[in-house]
Regions:
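Anionic-ligand anchoring segments at beta-strand to alpha-helix junctions in alpha/beta enzyme folds, i.e.
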Residues: 1, 150-222
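Glycine-rich, anion-gripping cofactor-binding loops and their flanking helix/strand elements
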Residues: 1-32, 36-37, 197-238
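Glycine-rich phosphate/diphosphate-binding loops that line cofactor/substrate pockets in enzymes
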Residues: 6-13, 144-152
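Structured core elements
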Residues: 15-16, 71-72, 154-159, 222-224, ...
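General beta-strand structural signal in soluble alpha/beta enzymes
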Residues: 16, 72, 106, 184-188, ...
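Peripheral docking tails and interdomain loops at the edges
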Residues: 17-136, 141, 161
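Flexible loop/turn segments at secondary-structure boundaries
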Residues: 22-24, 78-80, 163-165, 192-195, ...
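ADP-ribose/adenylate-binding Rossmann-like module
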Residues: 236-246
Length: 246
């Protein structure tokens, strides 16, 4: 906490993103500790000179403007994916003209702009009636950029658990690495171990390290041996101009 106080001194704003939620707590765990550290630094400033600091291992905030405005964000609930656009939204929230929400959620839609079915519309109306401001708690960025390296190849597979899609993806990753020397990042979407259930597999290969770790919204090729894929997914989502669907 002594290092945190020194790092945050004089900052205009600080956003803390945590992959947890504690609805009955005053704050989430990390932001709670950071807020306590800032409070101790302010107490040091109120005490005056260095010799009279109440917390000698903490920084001294001599004026109120030394303390940053703190924002708290919650992400990844229910294993939901965090996109680069979500991080952009967290930063835009702090900027002048932004929403300035002190607590918010990323990567989750409490209510959607358009319901998929009439029953879902009824359900969302019930949520809006019970929680009128629930939509204000979700934040999205103004854009979701493609941060994959230049020359990257991105593939998404839609299949059914037990059909061997995961093994196919693993073999493809090993082949690209051994023959081309590409850096590989690949992962099955959660739930792929359930036989008979729809599953998704993501793979990207690039001549340099791949720094992002999320589902790919920009893909060069989509492979699907599942004839019913359009009934439970949108396999064309994120397919680039000139991309391939097999």
């Amino acid at each position: 906490s002594d290092l945190v106080g020194e790092i945050l001194k004089g900052r205009k704003g600080v956003v803390v993103l945590e992959r947890t939620d504690q609805p009955l707590a005053e704050d989430l765990p990390l932001i709670r500790e950071i807020r306590a550290t800032v409070s101790k630094c302010l107490e040091n400033g109120m005490a005056g000179g260095t010799g009279s600091q109440r917390y000698p291992h903490h920084a001294m905030y001599a004026k109120l403007s030394d303390a940053p405005v703190l924002y708290s964000g919650c992400f990844g609930m229910g294993s939901r994916d965090l996109q680069p656009g979500d991080v952009i939204g967290a930063v835009e929230n702090m900027l002048p003209g932004g929403a300035q929400r002190k607590f918010f959620y990323l990567s989750i839609d409490f209510v959607r702009d358009q319901a998929a079915t009439p029953k879902q519309e009824i359900f969302m109306n019930q949520i809006r009636e019970g929680y009128p401001k629930i939509k204000e708690m979700q934040i999205k960025g103004s854009e979701n950029p493609n941060l994959l390296p230049k020359g990257a190849i991105t593939v998404r597979m839609h299949s059914v658990g037990g059909w061997g899609a995961i093994t196919t993806g693993k073999n493809l990753a090993v082949t690209l690495n051994e023959l081309l020397g590409y850096d590989i990042k690949a992962n099955p979407k959660y739930g792929s171990e359930k036989k008979g259930q729809p599953t998704t597999y993501y793979l990207s290969a690039a001549p340099e390290p791949i720094k992002i770790n999320c589902e790919y919204h920009f893909v060069d090729a989509v492979l699907s041996p599942d004839p019913n894929v359009f009934g439970h997914s949108n396999p064309l989502f994120g397919l680039k101009e000139g991309g391939v669907f097999i």
